[in-house]
Design a protein with these regions (language model features):
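Generic structural hydrophobic/aromatic packing signal, biased to beta-strands
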Residues: 1-2, 8-10, 57-61, 96-98, ...
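A mature extracytoplasmic/lumenal domain signature
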Residues: 12-14, 63, 100, 141-143, ...
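Generic recognition of flexible, low-complexity loop/linker segments
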Residues: 45-48, 124-126, 200, 239
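An acidic-aromatic substrate-binding cleft motif
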Residues: 50-127, 132, 136
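Aromatic- and carboxylate-enriched substrate-binding clefts and catalytic-loop regions
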Residues: 140-249
């Protein structure tokens, strides 16, 4: 926000096989910003590529209101057209669910008397979502064991916690015009995640679990790479393409 009638967004488009841009205060001062690329682990190399190589578009959007920035088609027009002929399964939507209660300590991720993602509690969120036109209900901590890559980590993201009847919850959601959103916490162990994601996503497709939220809580991806460096950008692209194979949002 520059003033009451002037809003500016600095962003990028067609970020493909390249490091994400970040902005920081310029050493020159005078309220100016400097652009910098998220580097590879050695902190010196930003992008590894052979020429010719396309760089992302850098965008500046200007509008008289925040809504004007959202309505702009600039970034969409600078991205390549969608590769998929049929995108009817893509469903932009809102979601609520078992999440914040875990962060404030009201409920717990893992099993026990305070476990948040139990059948009764998730159905309570489904009722709320149905009454408020919210399309999905997320349940963090719905599967057995902890996040992937931790002691006792889940090997699959498929087996539900002892106090969650997954079939009952998914069916109840559909009966009320809501869908269940599965959570996958990788703990940044993305190489391990790659080994199992076909099995996981196939299970979701077969059981009408059409959306996921993937977490990357931890230090660096695969204990090495910055989240928004070139390696991370390519990993996220691979993940999106993999979920698309199974018609998962």
């Amino acid at each position: 926000k520059i003033d009451d009638n002037l809003y500016i967004s600095l962003y990028e488009a067609d970020l493909t096989d390249y490091a994400k841009k970040k902005k920081k205060n310029s050493r020159q001062g005078n309220n100016t910003l400097e652009s910098a690329l998220v580097p590879w682990p050695d902190e010196k190399v930003k992008v590894k590529a052979s020429t010719p190589h396309k760089t992302p578009w850098r965008t500046i959007q200007i509008a008289s209101s925040p809504g004007g920035l959202i309505e702009s088609k600039l970034i969409q027009n600078l991205n390549d057209p969608c590769d998929y002929e049929n995108i009817d399964w893509i469903d932009p939507a809102k979601y609520c669910g078992v999440w914040w209660s875990l962060h404030i300590g009201k409920e717990t991720w893992s099993g026990g008397p305070q476990h948040g993602a139990n059948t009764k509690n998730v159905k309570r969120y489904i009722d709320f979502a149905a009454k408020n036109d919210i399309e999905y209900v997320l349940a963090e901590g719905w599967y057995k064991y902890g996040p992937l890559g931790t002691k006792g980590g889940s090997p699959e993201f498929i087996t539900p916690a002892d106090d969650l009847d997954l079939e009952e919850v998914v069916n109840y959601a559909h009966e009320n015009g809501v869908k269940f959103m599965a959570y996958n916490e990788t703990g940044c162990q993305v190489e391990e995640y790659r080994k199992i994601w076909d099995k996981v996503f196939q299970f979701y497709e077969e059981n009408d679990m059409t959306a996921i939220k993937v977490g990357h809580v931890g230090g660096r991806l695969a204990d090495k790479y910055h989240h928004h460096g070139q390696w991370g950008v390519n990993y996220y692209q691979e993940l999106i393409e993999k979920t698309a194979q199974y018609h998962i949002d």
